[in-house]
């Protein structure tokens, strides 16, 4: 197999949007691949030529007649394909089915991408799933991680992270609920039957006491920051199910059920935007902001730049306050709508400083302003305001105002039942937040 068809959902229908070709399928993506929009799709979208909005596969692959290759294509594909522990599980479970003339990354792309996050899918992967009868499971079976259910979920491409075994990260699942309350892997259910699209997370690793508390804390965090006005996971339906192991149930922000159809939103990670092809790569906040600013300006969103910059800096302050050190380039995304581009809601917000693996920040400010986990927020505002051509005094005052808002977090989180282990952790400053903000010159 040297070619795959990338399908794109926009204006309430799927389109055969682009053809992906491999230089050598046996050597995989590293050997090279090219991507070109399909002429019929381009003709249908003539008035959208050069657009980076929802009609494009990526902000780095604007709609047009050019053929793309290299890092922009590879980075965009990595937003779609299973990674990390999910990939390791799939390799073990289905690797023996891989043809000898096809590399594992090409095989997974062709088999395991029927309904990834966002508005893209691989046509050939979806056709494989569509040929298999769909099976629904009760919420209780999902909560209890019924073995039969997990096997089926992986076969249908519903798992985007983790593995079923006790030795690895637990799965993250993409499931669709129908009117009868049963849950199906997203790709196996017709849009006309969909009621709710769920993103479900289980504890990491072997689901030890700390892993469970991290997940419980994540639930509390979403509840609390919503009350403070941050754009985050939808509160309706947000639930922590305990069961034998806790599971966090969240409505997906890349799906919206409307009359007789499902709206799918183009979600693109910061890694993809920066053409980063190595998972876990270190980034500089200023490089991320520079790319976002260029994108906003290219789409004539200059009037929204101040809000973008403030929100970006506010979110990093929030990460520091809540001990979320896992700030790699796939934990922040943009949504490319049909009219505008925006930051995706806050997601993957958890006290990862508690994790036994010792997770550290992978996206940082320059060493002159961030050392050993301590950030000089006044200096950050100076650098960012210069980059974005904004008044430094305004940005710094807005960040101080945010700090005043965040002083409500300790009470909010305690009322929500934040685990004591999180509350007491030495690298999470919630117990001494006023003192910490004073040290940061934010109070």
Model-derived regions: residue spans:
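Phosphate/dinucleotide-binding and metal-coordinating scaffold of catalytic cores
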Residues: 1-443
